[in-house]
Amino acid sequence: MVKSPLKALVISLVFLFVLGFLFPTVTSLITEKALPNQSEGQPIKIDGKVYGSYLLAEAFNSSIFFHPRPSAIGYNLSESGSYPYSLGNPEVLNLTEKYLDEFLKDNPGINASQIPYAMLSYSASGLDPNIPLQGALIQIPRISIALHSITNNSVSLWENYLNDLVNKYTTQNFPFFGSYYVNIMYLNVNILEYLMNNGYIKSLNSIPP
């Protein structure tokens, strides 16, 4: 037990300095050096400009991109959240049917049984960039046809490219027993950079619908 008020004050100031300044500063500096991209929030940089983060989903509505999970907030990066409905609320079923119809319309040729439920349900944050592996694979035919229409590459060539891309960015949320998922932001940025680097798209404003 510290009896002297002066000693107690000194100890408090030392702990305040170490835990409130020194430790956070050292940790931040180490993180910036060891993981520079992660420490900055994994920003998406195109032509030297930041256009978002790989950690936050955005609305990729064009047919040449992988589509994310539904969002209750319209992918608004300034907020996060979901609908205030319980699972037993009839509105949840209505929304699921709506998302199912939209997904089938955007991806003709697939069956409803092929669609993972996560692709038909909104995430808790509304900004989840990860989708199930199956949710990415069933979008490849649609994307391949769309990319073929604006490039000289065949549909089969695009299918191979996209399959390799999905495999590259597929991760498992838990080792051995976890499910496989893929971050669509990495997939779509790769597609965008390929098209821009090869002259198929001049700028972000010239992305086809």
Curated annotation (Swiss-Prot):
GO cellular component: plasma membrane
Keyword Cytoplasm: no
GO molecular function, one term: ATP binding
InterPro entries linked to this entry: KdpC
Pfam families, per the entry: KdpC
Location(s), subcellular: Cell membrane
Annotated family: Belongs to the KdpC family.
Record's function text: Part of the high-affinity ATP-driven potassium transport (or Kdp) system, which catalyzes the hydrolysis of ATP coupled with the electrogenic transport of potassium into the cytoplasm. This subunit acts as a catalytic chaperone that increases the ATP-binding affinity of the ATP-hydrolyzing subunit KdpB by the formation of a transient KdpB/KdpC/ATP ternary complex.
Name assigned to this protein: Potassium-transporting ATPase KdpC subunit
Species this chain originates from: Thermoplasma volcanium (strain ATCC 51530 / DSM 4299 / JCM 9571 / NBRC 15438 / GSS1)
